[in-house]
Amino acid sequence: VNGFAEMTKHECLMTNEVRTVRCRGVRRGERLANWIGAWRKHRYAAFTLIELIVVIGIITILAGLVLSTAGYARKKGARARAETEIAAMSAALESYKADNATYVRNTDTDGLDAQTSGNPCAYGDASLYLYKQLSGDTNANFQPPAGAKSYFTFKPNMLGTSPTTTTDACGNTLTPTTVSYIRDPFGNIYGYSTIQETGTTTQGYNPTFDLWSTAGLTTPGQPTASDQNQWIKNW
């Protein structure tokens, strides 16, 4: 008609081009409105930069919350395990005393004072002696002498050993065949002291024995009251 091709209403509404066609039953304004709507739909089909930044920020916050919660759970679990181990070793020490009329004791345990020593690296000798006497493994080589009595069975993760020969943070040489000390759940050495057995009442805490974990803390020299409040201990 009049030299122009005609298009259907659907074709006219879908096109976004200017054509020299006659669109039967479709107004120009209707075509324009339909084209603008299609453009807006295409424009908002993807995330904007601001939206991406917001999403990344939310993910980062959630990841931080998960990590902090996991860290708290691990620390709480370690404290609970240390409390259980200290209670179990204390019971073993009572059994040892019943047989030997004294708690596990030597010059190393008599010389360690929980009041003045907050560095677990200083606990090694006393801790090793405690292991030898409670386990019966007096050579600390996993081969107790024949007839040796064991008062406590130490789990592998409680022992200062290593699958390969290495040096720990305290400078101790760890091997797979020898025990260097009793390890707490935080990776440090358990403290064990019998200093009040020497007759002093101004050092140490218990007249029997002191057994403790610094709960992951390392305090050079004398620990503060705040430090000791975080320890897991038998006093």
Predicted segment positions?
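N-terminal leader/signal peptides at the extreme start of proteins
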Residues: 1-47
